[in-house]
Amino acid sequence: MPTNGLHQVLKIQFGLVNDADRYLTAESFGFKVNASAASLKRKQIWVLEPDPGQGTAVLFRSSHLGRYLSAEEDGRVACEMDQPGRDCRFLVLPQPDGRWVLQSEPHGRFFGGIEDRLSCFATAISPAELWTVHLAIHPQAHLLSVSRRRYVHLCLQEDEMAADGDMPWGVDALVTLIFQSRRYCLKSYDSRYLRSDGRLVWEPEAHACYTLEFKAGKLAFKDCDGRYLAPVGPAGTLKAGRNTRPSKDELFDLEQSHPQVVLVAANRRYISVRQGINVSANQDEELGHETFLMQIDQETKKCTFYSSTGGYWTLVTHGGIQATATQVSANTMFEIEWHGRRVALKASNGRFVCMKKNGQLAAISDFVGEDELFTLKLINRPLLVLRGLDGFVCHRRGSNQLDTNRSTYDVFHLSFRDGAYQIRGRGGGFWYTGSHGSVCSDGDLAEDFLFEFRERGRLAIRALSGKYLRGGASGLLRADADLPVGEALWEY
């Protein structure tokens, strides 16, 4: 049976880009390394590990090989050691422009070069020894202050971001990391950027860009003056403090942002737990009690719904649905059936969830009719970043079409209407399907797309034609897939 996974810290994976805009690559053949790749794929992903000896050095492990980067005394570099040795220890020296310098700890030389001419033999730092850190994780997450154990969220009333939330509940807890001029910005759900003085601004100006630093698997954000973001004062306002070295106060975890949804029943009222433990369709507005965290089990593809009151929906006696379970079990798992703009939910007793005359939900139906259909709306992705098997979705230069194999990503705006979503891109143009299934991004009118949450962290997008959007060898986004699998699934 699946285990609870409400708070999953993301493993920080990244690529290293040299001055020639090429990624450090670990090859399977001969365990050689080069800097020839133009984009961030499987062979270009690295994981930072702390030195087992508790020193200041770190280890670079290839994500796909599981082997460690090493530098010998004569400067030769490879990625062949499956257990870290002395030559695998590097010091990371952050530079003022946000880039890293990697120095061999035992030999004191600097690592760099171009294409297949990489070495760790330089005695001085030149542009060839400078590396840009490019995160390989999905850039939308929750940010948890390590010292306060509180989540960062946007406080509209105070016009600030603060680390004061017990739970990352609602859309205001979503943070999007924006890669900008070799640094990262923190973008709130309303598209503003956090400046180091705590103010929120509409443009990614210099004081809203941060260098990433890693310490014991945690993240720190250094501003252009060399100070670090931290929660400040009783309210936990996020701004740059006085410290020029990261302590526990300046460290953060990135946690996976699971989809949070609201559901509307046939009576056009929101499903809620506001009036007690019974899950009922009896509210006219969507607030915390009407929001549910939805998790999909990777094995069964069934889902759970977790409420703001701290309980999972669970099947109880006589088919009732209550938000009282504290652990995931068979009775908390629901199978989703996709019916165009609506969904049906089948409980563990094999029956469909329906709305009774008093508004309460119960799994007592053998067939799907009007009372068994619900509108499901994703509320915590007003900004949408999509990543497929080959990379991120991004506007194609000089074209109205969309690439699906990029290392960088575009942030799209999402709106919702009657069970369907509308996607708006750069310049305010809407997505629409053109000839032969091509997806274009300069529409004057919004076209409806259906979202189907098929796997944990992945969705399928269905066009009006009934076909699913997919990537592929051409690198173009097309609406021509028959099934929501493989290239037609998107991390969001």
From Swiss-Prot:
The keyword Cytoplasm applies. GO terms for molecular function: actin binding; actin filament binding; protein-macromolecule adaptor activity. It is found in: Cytoplasm, Cytoskeleton; Cell projection, Stereocilium. Expressed in the inner ear. Abundant in the utricle. Its main location: cytoplasm. Gene3D superfamilies: 2.80.10.50. GO terms for biological process: actin cytoskeleton organization; actin filament organization; eye photoreceptor cell development. Keywords: Actin-binding, Cell projection, Cytoplasm, Cytoskeleton. Pfam families: Fascin. One of its GO terms (cellular component) is cytosol. It is linked to Defects in Fscn2 lead to hair-cell degeneration in the inner ear and are a key contributor to the early-onset, age-related hearing loss (prebycusis) phenotype when in combination with waltzer cadherin 23 mutant. Acts as an actin bundling protein. May play a pivotal role in photoreceptor cell-specific events, such as disk morphogenesis. Important for maintaining functional hair-cell bundles in the inner ear. May stiffen the longer stereocilia of hair-cell bundles in the inner ear enabling better force transmission to tip links. This is Fascin-2. It comes from Mus musculus (Mouse). The lineage of its organism: Eukaryota, Metazoa, Chordata, Craniata, Vertebrata.
